[in-house]
Amino acid sequence: MPLVRLQVRNVYGLGQKELHTKVDREDPKAILDDVAVSGLVGILRQLGDLTEFAAEIFHGIQEEVMITASRSNKLKMRLKQIEAKVPTIQKTVLAQTNHIHFAYTGGLEWHPRIPNVQNHFMYDELPPFIMTPYEDCREPPRLHLLDKFDINGPGSCLKRYSDPTHFKRASRASKPSEIKKKKSIQRGRDISRLASVANQSDRKTCTSLSFSGRTSTSKTASTIEIESKSDLQEHRSFSFDSRSGGEKPKRVSSSSRFTPGSRTIASVLSESESESDSPSQDLTARGSSSVSWHEKAEIVECNVLQCATDEAPEVMETNFVLDAEPVSRLKEHSAVEAVQDIKPKELEMDNEDETESEGDDFVDALYTIDSESENDEAFQATKEVQKNLYNDITEQETEKISNNFSVDETKCAATSELHLSSSPVYKSDELIHQDPWAASEISSGTHSYSNGFSNPLYDISGIQEHQESEEVESSCDTESIKTWTNGNLLGLKPSKPKIIAETIPEIVEDIDSETFQEHLREDYKAPFDWFTSSPPLDHMKISFKSSETLPSSELQLKLPDEYTFSSFQLVPETIATSLPDSDSDKDTFCRSSSYISDNSDNDNRSVSMSEQQWEEESEGIRESKRQQELYDSFHRVNAEASSLPVPFPKIETTNGCLVENVSYLQNPAEPLPPPLPPLQWMVSKIPSAGFEDNNKQSLKDALTQAFEKNNNSLTAVKKKEPHIVTVSDPKLVTKVHLKNNVRDYKQSHGNTNETEAGDFLHQIRTKQFNLRRVVRTKTSSSETTMNTNISVILEKANSIRQAVASDDGEGESDTWSDSDT
């Protein structure tokens, strides 16, 4: 409730003056009595005013109290109604087991969808201090009474004063007047400045015109020359052409300006008059009036558009006088010609959007000279020069684009041809070679060459086996090509990819065959025309084992040039391949790949590739595999008389067990082999490079027991002379260095080979698990040649083969003996 102050008047002012004015002034007692009476009257009046004010206040309070009492009475009535309804509702609520349906959801539905009402308070509920201003407000003007005097009909007068479009039109109409006022003020300021500058000197230099950061040409003009030209009516509208500056001028600024004296002032005055009258008339009346600054900006933009394809030239600096250089006239002609192409609407918009910057308006009369005549021939010459320049630049750009396109097209064509010619094609089981690297035999530790044939796919009988350990000539600068291959090249370095079992990555060899053949003929002196590559790897499965798990399988091959080769073994599946090079599906292919060791003296172990084994898919395949492997083990070496004399490198074992992979090639012209031995004799051949010392002791013990137990089984076999093929070559020099455990074994068992211990003994061990250990004695053994070792292996293999052939189901013992050895 607002507080209201009441101003109480003076007591004596409220009293009546007649009471003390009519008293005799000479009687003071009468005067005092009259004043006292008038004061009492004033007090009474003050009390009356206060009473009235209090009555108003208490009346409002009384009304508020009455309203509050009525509302309280209403609340009491509602409470009584609620009390009457609650018992019935309480019974229904208590009877319910689930009360979730009684949840209040009205507020959740109301708040997202607030009703758009005008007043949130009811009229009766507003307090009096809010309602009082509404009551005191006057009603809107009764404009509808004037509609009878308006021709637009009823409601037109109220719309006239409440329509927003009316105010928009009024504000739009007031803007041009404000712009005109600004123009007049700025022009008056420019005229005063131009007058002062014109009186300072007769000649001024125009410098430091900035076109987008570049300095334009500096030009000087003489007021005397300009005045003489004005007398001859040959003065022209001079403007800077964009080609002289080099780029499109975005903003023009000048530090000093030249003025032709009173002539410039007159031109400015005429400009202001003509511009205020009709801006569009300046375009039609060419030569009659000067060009404004807005027109000058349009001139520069039009000229820049004509030479937009020109490259930005370097800044040119020249000093010339207007009457001495005809080039300036040509530029003036082009500028005046461009003025005609400007639309009046564009100029009008520029005039309305004129900026308030003094720097821009200060250049209104700068470099502007009235022109009345034109030199048509010079102007046409300028247009021809511009056209020729544009054509030359266009031809140059087109020529550059065509050259780039032809180069790119040639590159794309060469790339596509390269991909088409270098990609190998595989069709079913056939391997189509697009390079002279044909399929070749892979043997353990050797390379198969053909003596005097060009294509191994059509000549089979000429294939011969040779052991190769030729010295590889290399240097520190050249690094061997990192291509994964199982071919017969010692110069290729394996990249050692991580190969999963039953998967072989396809390799595209990009080596030039002719260059490689010439290199091999010069360095290795190999008598062949085409290199024979490996057989197709479509059905080959390669599985790698870490060299750390089998430390005894590491071999260190020492060559004269300190190169170490790691060997790996590939075994084809039983499925026949389509190439004629593979005469037998059960052949064992081995290949040596070059691997450069950093320091072979510090470490006796060379990095070798782990052995790879076939994973048989069924038990029947395994049985047939074992039978053929047992037969193949009896034909390890079939040396030909025409073998090349190749020196064999020294082999030093690291863990005391040496396994030699001797190459062989089965001759299809030979007769069929004898019948296979019984299945009880069949053992799975597991190629291994070496075992632990304890395993070797067990194997030696088992071999000794087997040969002593079955001494009589091979007595009849020994009577027949076996067919032994001995590889004898005077150039073959092989030195085998064995450690103590190998030496003890060789001295105790004579010429029994380490390959036999690693191959046959392991086979026996897989069938007999209860073997006793044999204590070894350390003895020294002498060096033996490789020829003796191979002869012993062949003799033992042929003896067992003939024994098996002579058995032929006669019920002999199924054991072997070592009595004849």
UniProtKB/Swiss-Prot annotation:
Bias type Acidic residues, positions:
807-821
Where does the record say this protein resides?
Cytoplasm, Cytoskeleton
Query: Where does the record place Basic and acidic residues bias?
Result: 226-250
Q: Which Gene3D superfamilies match?
A: 1.20.5.340, 6.10.280.150
The residue ranges flagged as biased composition, category Low complexity, are 592-612
Instruction: List, in alphabetical order, the Gene Ontology terms for molecular function in this entry.
Output: actin monomer binding
Q: Name one GO cellular component term.
A: cell periphery
Superkingdom field: Eukaryota
UniProt KW keywords:
Actin-binding, Cytoplasm, Cytoskeleton
Boundaries of every WH2 domain copy: 756-774
The residues forming a coiled coil are none
Question: Which residue ranges run through the membrane?
Answer: none
Q: What does this protein do?
A: Involved in regulation of actin and microtubule organization. Part of a WAVE complex that activates the Arp2/3 complex. Regulates trichome branch positioning and expansion.
Q: What is this protein called?
A: Protein SCAR1
Species of origin reads Arabidopsis thaliana (Mouse-ear cress)
